[in-house]
Amino acid sequence: ITPVQSKSKTLLHSIGRKEGMANVGEQQDEVLTVDKKLFSEELERLMDCHNKLNALVFFKMVHSAYNKAINDFNQKKLIFYHIHNPDTYAQLNFVQSSPSTKWVMMVRDPVQNCESWIRNKFFEGDYSDVSQMIITMLSELDNIVYSRQNAVGVRLEDLKEHPNKTIPALCKWMGIEEKNSLYEMSAQSKKWWGDPSSPDYKKDGMNPFGKTSISRQVGSILSENDQLILSTLFYPFNVRFGYVEENLEKFKIDLKAIKPMLRNMFDFEHAIMKQAESDVDQFMKSGSYLSFRSTLIRRWDYLDKYLTYAN
């Protein structure tokens, strides 16, 4: 099986199997497949119909060829494309190629989301990846793509707790018809049982509206001090999406409180360093540590000056 290159340039192997795509169907005994020969032939046929191609036309052709390869002959006017965690070049290139694209961003309580996202790498002791993940989250707060394009943020909590209100509203914004299949977990019209790698898989990971992920208490990795720093830096986002009530005076107090804390190690950093039996000075001189500190301080400086982010 051909591996897929990730954003960090590492190769990911057997993604489909790891995400449960080899155990679909009512009896979990079916495998998602694509006829490579049919896909290639259809893509070549579509390409032969054009004297010249650009990235967007080819992008649409790939989807059309895929549909034919899985025997899906429904006429479709829209493409729902999961551009998961793209790097800056890929995202801006996509915007340039398709400026009329509508962007849907799934959002979640940021500190809870942060702890969930870094969990695996934290327990692996991979500080470089952990720090980069937090940098990515902080950098997304004023991503210019979402302010300049037709974009909407959908709270995971609303989708899980109020699907009968959230899904119809999203359908209206997207210009699609609400159907029962939108309330089901499926792939190629086959029942999908969820991602086996999810920590919630055995609890309610097979339920599309399971609430374990949004009910999990924060604190298994991030201490109260860690949470204070991050929640303060996420404050404008938290207010905008209703995770906290607006309280500007408290925010200003918290900003002042965390300023000296930014130059000290987070408690989760102490834990990783202890696990790796690293030297403190060496750890604090590492590129990952310095890059993380630079991002924290730049985010703080911006909030101190404007009390919000650009978008």
Task: Label every model-predicted segment.
Residues 16, 20-35, 42, 54, ...:
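Poly-acidic low-complexity segments
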Residues 13, 41, 64, 68, ...:
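Charged/polar, solvent-exposed surface patches and flexible loops
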Residues 42-50, 55-183, 191-207:
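PAPS-dependent sulfotransferase catalytic domain
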Residues 1-57, 305-311:
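PAPS-dependent sulfotransferase catalytic core
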Residues 176-311:
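PAPS-dependent sulfotransferases, especially Golgi type II membrane carbohydrate sulfotransferases
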Residues 8, 152-153, 215:
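Preference for short coil/turn "hinge" residues that link or interrupt alpha-helices
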Residues 2-32, 70-99, 271, 278, ...:
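Short, charged N-terminal helix-start/capping segments
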